[in-house]
Amino acid sequence: MTRIIDVSLFCFFLFSLGAMSQPSQNLTDCNQFPDTYQSNRNTVLSTLRNHSSLGSYYFNATAGLSPNTVYGMFLCIGNISKTSCSNCVHSATLEMDKSCESHDTSFMFSDECMVRYSDNSFFSLVEDSPATFSYSQNDSLSYPQFYNQTLPGKLDELILKAPSSFSSPVPYFVEDKEHVTQVEGSYDLEAMAQCSPDLDPSSCTVCLGLVVEKFSECCSQSRWARIHFPKCLLRYDISALQPNLTSLGVTTKGDDIFGRTFIAIMIGLLMGL
């Protein structure tokens, strides 16, 4: 089941660590909340910071009683270091302390982690909003028909693998790199998929399926793309197509020797007739 979040009293940011540079966005007006809610919010953010320092890639926390309960979580990308994960969560929670103190719901996405809190429980729910999209726009695929023979199958493969990888060191995280050789040329294809561990396997599958639908809408002509939903993500990166030498009429020395030998044998056979 998909839960669409009400964006009233909502703070949504894209933030950056290192090379990526994304502008922060505040989508709504600010309102003041009771001191009890603010205290619970600060407790949740502090708890998330502390657990990220322990090497966790995912954690959720709850503080307070209704109507001032605050729910929070973080999820780090499965292929970054534990130190990078902790640094990302620390930066996000500190930014929330500074920029979102008057909001009852907040998301922060970056290239390495996602951090959020809300006054409504979102645990175990599949959500398709808000979502972040990033993809190459000035570096489109020269021959998309060649890549499209491989990319959909690779994404389908990861969607099947991710829900069954809950017991791996980073639950629900899978990645793969493949060198693809076709008649037209060769290229490297890297892809990854990840779900939040609070989802059950079937919900993980549903979430990733929704992301694939977004890929087909936004990014089918892009060399790389990243789509993050609140509970799952997909990424891929395709190298430039490298033409095969044989497809350009170029032969290696070995091929040339083989060709001359074959011709000599055929001439000898014909002369013997």
Curated annotation (Swiss-Prot):
Source organism superkingdom: Eukaryota
Signal peptide: 1-21
Disulfide bonds: none
Location(s) in or outside the cell: Secreted
Cellular component GO terms, alphabetical: extracellular region; plasma membrane
Gnk2-homologous domain boundaries: 22-122, 128-241
Record keywords, A-Z: Repeat, Secreted, Signal
Chief location of this protein within or outside the cell: secreted
Pfam family, one: Stress-antifung
Entry similarity comment: Belongs to the cysteine-rich repeat secretory protein family.
Name of the protein in question: Probable cysteine-rich repeat secretory protein 6
Top-level taxonomy: Eukaryota, Viridiplantae, Streptophyta, Embryophyta, Tracheophyta
